[in-house]
């Protein structure tokens, strides 16, 4: 049997994964996949190790992990495959597939256009009520936003590694 796992980034906001969960449900309904699970790399769970274990316990011998990311950043290039390789050691009988991320697809152009059109009735950002930041505490040592200075960014853009 085959399982599909949609693997997202994760968030401190409990509702953040609901859209991905809806996508998983629709994949099952529309295409008949017997098992489509959702998990996250970090923050609130469920996390990949426990989700993979669930699939294995249900007898899946092939698990396809689809990274639910738009861009091939560090998580796609290193973090996720590294995490998957570590977990794969526990289940030598299971074929663990690292699938394609969302990346570019012509259907995304239509989706972005839909969002642009739907934004016509949106409020000016200054009118949006914000929840208190204290509601979403930041773990020690982590920042809300980590910008890269232009010189450092130029090095990464030039050779792709920053080394």
Task: Please tell me what each predicted stretch does.
Residues 1-163:
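Extended amphipathic ligand-handling, pore-lining, and cofactor/metal-binding catalytic surfaces
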